[in-house]
């Protein structure tokens, strides 16, 4: 798996988010996340425990097996990282529009 380049001139922004919806990050929430991340040019990776995946990959996100009450960390590098992380924070707070 690809790791975050820590030698970049831009410092990564990191946001840890709590998965609050009942079913966790399954196909639909993963697609919602990717819909947001793909609108931005920044690089984004998602970590759960020791595993890191590309935040622009539905399959990668599903492989994290992030269930309810899991914490996932978004690591974004680029000029538009902050607004993207803000959108993701809102999406997680809305519980992916699920009950």
Short names for language-model regions:
Residues 18-59, 63-67, 76:
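Compact, glycine-rich, soluble single-domain proteins
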Residues 8, 60-62, 83, 89:
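Intrinsic-disorder/low-complexity peptide segments enriched for small residues
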Residues 14-18, 45, 85, 89:
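A general secondary-structure boundary signal
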Residues 10-16, 71-73:
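Intrinsic-disorder/low-complexity, polar/charged segments enriched in Ser/Thr/Lys/Arg/Asp/Glu/Gln
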Residues 14, 27, 93-94:
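Short, intrinsically disordered low-complexity segments
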């Amino acid at each position: 798996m690809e790791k975050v380049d820590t030698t970049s001139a831009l410092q990564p922004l990191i946001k840890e988010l709590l998965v609050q919806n009942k079913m966790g990050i399954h196909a639909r929430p993963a697609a919602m996340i990717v819909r947001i991340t793909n609108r931005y040019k920044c690089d984004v990776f998602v970590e759960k425990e020791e595993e890191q995946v590309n935040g622009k990959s539905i399959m990668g996100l599903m492989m994290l097996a992030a269930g309810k009450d899991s914490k996932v960390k978004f690591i974004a590098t680029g000029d538009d990282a902050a607004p993207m992380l803000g959108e993701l924070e809102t999406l997680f707070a809305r519980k992916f529009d699920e009950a």
